[in-house]
């Protein structure tokens, strides 16, 4: 597990390379906003080398985040992309199209239109009431899985245009993929009779592992894909939980605060994921070597595998997530086919409505 000192030192090197264009889905609050401030702080003296698209629902909060970040990093370019509900694939498509439009019409410094970093932190309360979107997806499953894969696929033209290795980061439950039995194959929608936030986590983390590995293979040397568990981070998410949870959390907070991650540290860890330590598959671009004891291992247990599942300090959780007893020759294809079929079906239906 890298220390915060190691993490900060690595992040401090980000401005030394070429300029960075980033997009943060869910960047108006919580972890997304902590990351935004970490990027602004990192580029405090190099503002002209940073452009960030903040995607979210609340324009007021976005204005506050952007104002604070511009003060921290004078000269940096911050843009708000409004999305009413990122559980909807149509809103993901709309947001992605707007990013592509703006980046194509006015590429950063007149350089090639591209996206170097894509962070996805958008979420809904995991203990809230089950809700089905107008597109037919469970809102929780969509927010933490389907909409995130859609973001990646829609923004691939910009991501693969990056002169760097583009980094894609999904913040949810990396390293928490354990609990899958050898005879289980949690691919598809969570059946109603076993629906629970733990079951949703099992299905979505299982599929995400295999789809990220598939993308890492398809876009070797171009994409690094990371699924991370941020730890217990104090923020507005707790106020959106059911009343019983808020009361319990208030009573337990003096104790839980001992285990909480500070917002500044969380933001710095998120920024650390943009460094070359998390390399694409087959990339030799400043990639760590297997002799590096702190080198992150991919979900396949190798250094530089391109698809990573990490704990709250960006530490590899390989033994838990390799699914050695669950991997079959067609597991990856099943996860990929289900995901693409689901997204394509929704896109076709949306096209007939538009």
Curated annotation (Swiss-Prot):
Leader sequence segment: none
Keyword Oxidoreductase: yes
Domain of life: Eukaryota
SUPFAM superfamilies reported for this sequence: NAD(P)-binding Rossmann-fold domains
Family annotation (Gene3D superfamilies): NAD(P)-binding Rossmann-like Domain
Keywords: NADP, Oxidoreductase
Known pathway: Mycotoxin biosynthesis
Record InterPro entries: NAD(P)-bd_dom_sf, Sec_Metab_Biosynth_Oxidored
Annotated residues for binding of NADP(+): 31, 85, 201, 233
Entry EC no(s): 1.-.-.-
GO molecular function terms noted in the UniProt entry: oxidoreductase activity
Additional remarks: Trichothecenes are sesquiterpenoid toxins that act by inhibiting protein biosynthesis.
Cited function: Short-chain dehydrogenase/reductase; part of the satratoxin SC1 cluster involved in the biosynthesis of satratoxins, trichothecene mycotoxins that are associated with human food poisonings. Satratoxins are suggested to be made by products of multiple gene clusters (SC1, SC2 and SC3) that encode 21 proteins in all, including polyketide synthases, acetyltransferases, and other enzymes expected to modify the trichothecene skeleton. SC1 encodes 10 proteins, SAT1 to SAT10.
Family: Belongs to the short-chain dehydrogenases/reductases (SDR) family.
Name of the protein in question: Short-chain dehydrogenase/reductase SAT2
Annotated source species: Stachybotrys chartarum (strain CBS 109288 / IBT 7711)
Gene: SAT2
């Amino acid at each position: 597990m890298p220390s915060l000192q190691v993490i900060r030192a690595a992040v401090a090197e980000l401005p030394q390379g070429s300029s960075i264009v980033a997009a943060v889905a869910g960047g108006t609050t919580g972890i997304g906003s902590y990351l935004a401030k970490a990027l602004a702080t990192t580029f405090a003296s190099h503002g002209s080398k940073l452009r960030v698209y903040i995607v979210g629902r609340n324009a007021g909060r976005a204005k506050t985040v952007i104002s604070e970040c511009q003060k921290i990093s004078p000269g940096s370019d911050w843009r708000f992309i409004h999305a009413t509900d990122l559980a909807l694939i149509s809103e993901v498509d709309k947001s992605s199209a707007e990013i592509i439009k703006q980046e194509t019409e006015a590429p950063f410094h007149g350089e090639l239109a591209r996206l170097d970093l894509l962070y996805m932190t958008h979420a809904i309360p995991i203990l809230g009431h089950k809700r089905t979107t107008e597109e037919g997806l469970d809102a929780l499953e969509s927010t933490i899985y389907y909409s995130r894969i859609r973001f990646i696929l829609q923004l691939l033209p910009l991501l693969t245009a990056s002169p760097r290795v583009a980094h894609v980061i999904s913040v949810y439950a990396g390293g928490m993929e354990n609990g899958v039995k050898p005879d289980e194959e949690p691919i598809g929608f969570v059946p109603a009779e076993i629906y629970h936030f733990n079951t949703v986590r099992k299905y979505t983390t299982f599929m995400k592992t295999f789809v990220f590995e598939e993308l890492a293979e398809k876009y070797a040397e171009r994409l690094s894909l990371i699924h991370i568990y941020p730890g217990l981070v104090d923020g507005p998410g707790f106020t959106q939980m059911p009343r019983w949870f808020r009361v319990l959390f208030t009573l337990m907070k003096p104790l839980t605060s001992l285990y909480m991650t500070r917002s500044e540290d969380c933001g710095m860890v998120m920024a650390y994921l943009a460094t070359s330590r998390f390399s694409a598959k087959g990339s030799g671009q400043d990639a760590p070597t297997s002799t590096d004891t702190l080198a992150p291992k991919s979900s396949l247990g190798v250094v530089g595998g391109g698809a990573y599942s990490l704990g709250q300090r960006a530490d590899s959780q390989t033994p838990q997530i390799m699914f050695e007893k669950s991997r079959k020759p067609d597991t990856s294809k099943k996860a990929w086919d289900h995901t693409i079929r689901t997204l394509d079906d929704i896109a076709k239906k949306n096209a007939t409505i538009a």
